[in-house]
């Protein structure tokens, strides 16, 4: 029934964001509240990205030391990944998005005139807060259902460059980090 479908979708969303597969069976701007987007989905996006980074740090340390006795503290790696890498980068990318016109507010829908001259109601919300961690953590669950192809989520060429950079920077940094740990 319809009620059980809602619970199934909620369970699926929760589990998929917890394990970083970010399967999204809803359109973010209309399927979730601002609170849920900011304090549940975004939290999972930070935690799942930091979990992958922390696990990789442990693997790199074990390769470098050639022993499993000194791989470090997973929880320390997790907190450092969130507070020293993901959060600062998210703030910088979010600031760029705001400067370029990505919505950041709680105003609801706005009326716009399309290229064809028709008026249409378009959702907006805390998009500039959610997009950076979605991109940095290579998460699939975006604020808008069509993700970065939505004109409000990615309004200019500069936002497109910032979002593409955000997807690539952490995986590329992991390659350099492996070289640092192995001294090569």
Question: What are these model-predicted stretches?
Answer:
Residues 1, 108-113:
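Helix-loop-helix hairpins and the membrane-proximal interhelical loops
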Residues 9-18, 23-31:
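Long, highly hydrophobic alpha-helical transmembrane signal-anchor segments
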Residues 2-7:
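Short, small-residue-biased leader/transition segments that mark boundaries at the very start
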Residues 12, 52, 60, 64, ...:
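Generic structural signal for short, flexible, solvent-exposed coil/loop and linker residues
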Residues 32-106, 157-184:
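A conserved hydrophobic secondary-structure block that centers on an alpha-helix together
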Residues 16-19, 25, 96-97, 101, ...:
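Membrane-embedded translocation segments of transport machinery
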Residues 8-11, 56, 68, 126-129, ...:
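Alpha-helix initiation and N-capping motif
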């Amino acid at each position: 029934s319809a009620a059980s479908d809602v619970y199934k979708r909620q369970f699926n969303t929760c589990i998929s964001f917890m394990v970083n597969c970010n399967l999204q069976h809803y359109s973010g701007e209309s399927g979730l509240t601002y609170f849920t987007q900011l304090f549940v989905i975004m939290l999972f996006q930070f935690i799942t990205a930091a979990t992958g980074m922390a696990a990789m740090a442990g693997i790199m340390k074990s390769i470098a030391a050639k022993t499993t006795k000194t791989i470090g503290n997973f929880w320390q790696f997790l907190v450092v990944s969130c507070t020293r890498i993901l959060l600062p980068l998210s703030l910088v990318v979010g600031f760029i998005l705001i400067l370029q016109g990505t919505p950041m507010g709680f105003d609801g829908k706005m009326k716009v005139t399309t290229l064809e001259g028709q008026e249409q109601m378009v959702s907006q919300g805390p998009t500039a807060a959610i997009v950076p961690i979605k991109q940095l953590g290579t998460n699939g669950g975006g604020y808008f259902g069509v993700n970065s192809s939505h004109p409000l989520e990615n309004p200019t060429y500069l936002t497109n460059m910032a979002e593409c950079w955000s997807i690539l920077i952490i995986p590329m940094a992991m390659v350099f980090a492996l070289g640092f740990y192995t001294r090569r």
